[in-house]
Every structure is written in structure tokens, then in C-alpha cells.
């Protein structure tokens, strides 16, 4: 499956796509139960997961990368914009929460994208990545939207976040439902999740990781500024 907006819209209209949305959304809300008064950005194809924030957050924006294309969402008052990974069209530190779904794995330069997300995230803000698990069936099957681009082991995600001045704070997994499930199996999604979390935790379809700005990343510009001042006085 190509990671473009049209294919993803079609996937989330299927029985297995709707089940996947429910399973992932459930874990997302456990990690982020409250967004009242916050400014929320969804990056990638995050719109299936942003609806709960519309009635709570101060502001919700869905940014879709140029190579993916864009769809109008929600109906009647579109909040979607198109942007480039290397230059997100926002000022610094404007979002309190950033949700990334179908975004990191397809990025041309994942580190550059994460540095841009760091730039637009508020100092006390949080980013939540939903990324395909390299060990899962969802990352192996061609018809799966989580098989596009680069899948990740947990350690790879951890290293990538730390390299881009994020500090991982919470980890979770979701999506034990097989990607080839028909309507009948898709209805049993909650049962698949319970069994998978208990007996096969490493085979979840996606990793979920919440991260904040690292103290090193926040302190570094100040240290550089002091060093430059000292050199200027010398």
C-alpha cells in the first residue's frame, strides 16, 4: 500500500481499519486523557485519531506531508494543512501536544522531521509517536498501511528520540488484531488486544511512545549563548 491520503482514507473505512482505529485510540486516550485548553497538532495521517480532541482542545490542526497529499477534515470547517518535513509552517513552541501517526515511518529524513517537531513543541509539551513495530505482521504485509516506509524496534525509536533531543517518558503497544482480518474477526478486536498484551506483547502492530523535550536540549542554546558572550568579551 502506498502511504498516501487516498489509500489511508480507504483503509480506515474498512472493518479492519475501523477496528485498528479503535484499538489505537483506546491506548492514546490512556496516555493523553485530558487536552482541555491545549493546542494540538496531528502530523502525518492523524485525522482518524484527532476527533476526541475537537471538543476539548483550544486548537486542533492536522498537518499532512506534501508527498502524502491532503484531505479536507473535519467536514464543514477544514483544519488540515499541507507542509514539508524540513520546514513545518508554524512558529516556535506553539503546540502543547503533537500526535504523529503514519508520519515518522514515511519521512524522507526522520531526524530532520523530529527536530522540526521539537521546534514547534512548547517547552513543557509532549509528542506522542505511533510507529510500526518491526516485529509485527502489520509491518510485513504489503496491504497494510503500517508496512510503508521504515518500521522500528523499540530500541531504534528510543535512540532516534534521544538523538533529536527528546526524552522518552511513556511506552505502550497496540494492534494485535491480524492485518488480514475480515469483518467477523475485526469485531473481536478487544479480545485480540487482551490476548496479545498478555501472551505476545512483542508482536503488537505499533509502538506508542510519549516524549518531552530533554533538559539537555532546552539548556543547550543558553550554554551556547553564554559561551558566545564570553568569547566576545575576550
Located regions from the model:
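Class I SAM-dependent methyltransferase Rossmann-like catalytic core
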Residues: 1-34
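Class I SAM-dependent methyltransferase SAM/SAH-binding core
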Residues: 34-88
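Hydrophobic beta-strand segment of the Class I
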Residues: 98-99
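A short glycine-rich, Lys/Arg-flanked "PGG" loop and its adjoining helix->strand segment in the class I
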Residues: 111-126
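Conserved class I S-adenosyl-L-methionine
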Residues: 126-155
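Short alpha-helix
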Residues: 147-171, 175, 207
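Conserved catalytic loop of SAM-dependent methyltransferase domains
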Residues: 169-194, 202-204
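C-terminal lobe and adjacent flexible extensions of AdoMet/dcAdoMet transferase-like proteins
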Residues: 193-234
Amino acid at each position: 500500500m502506498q502511504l498516501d491520503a487516498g489509500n489511508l482514507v480507504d483503509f480506515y473505512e474498512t472493518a479492519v481499519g475501523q477496528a485498528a482505529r479503535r484499538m489505537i485510540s483506546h491506548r492514546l486516550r490512556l496516555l493523553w486523557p485530558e487536552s482541555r485548553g491545549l493546542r494540538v497538532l496531528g502530523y502525518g495521517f492523524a485525522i482518524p485519531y484527532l476527533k476526541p480532541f475537537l471538543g476539548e482542545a483550544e486548537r486542533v490542526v492536522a498537518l499532512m506531508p506534501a508527498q502524502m497529499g491532503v484531505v479536507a477534515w473535519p467536514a464543514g470547517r477544514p483544519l488540515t494543512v499541507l507542509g514539508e518535513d524540513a520546514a513545518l509552517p508554524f512558529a516556535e513552541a506553539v503546540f502543547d501536544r503533537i500526535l504523529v501517526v503514519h508520519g515518522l515511518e514515511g519521512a524522507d529524513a526522520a531526524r530532520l522531521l523530529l527536530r522540526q517537531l521539537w521546534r514547534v513543541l512548547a517547552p513543557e509539551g509532549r509528542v506522542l509517536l505511533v510507529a510500526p513495530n518491526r516485529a509485527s505482521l502489520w509491518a510485513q504485509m504489503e496491504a497494510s498501511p503500517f508496512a510503508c516506509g521504515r518500521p522500528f524496534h523499540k530500541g531504534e525509536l528510543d535512540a532516534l528520540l534521544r538523538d533529536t533531543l527528546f526524552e522518552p517518558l511513556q511506552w505502550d503497544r497496540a494492534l494485535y488484531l491480524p492485518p488480514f482480518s475480515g469483518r467477523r474477526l475485526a469485531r473481536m478486536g478487544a479480545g485480540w488486544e487482551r490476548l496479545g498484551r498478555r501472551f505476545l506483547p512483542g508482536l503488537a502492530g505499533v509502538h506508542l511512545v510519549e516524549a518531552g523535550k530533554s533538559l539537555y536540549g532546552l539548556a543547550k542554546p543558553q550554554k551556547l549563548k553564554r559561551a558566545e558572550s564570553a568569547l566576545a568579551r575576550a
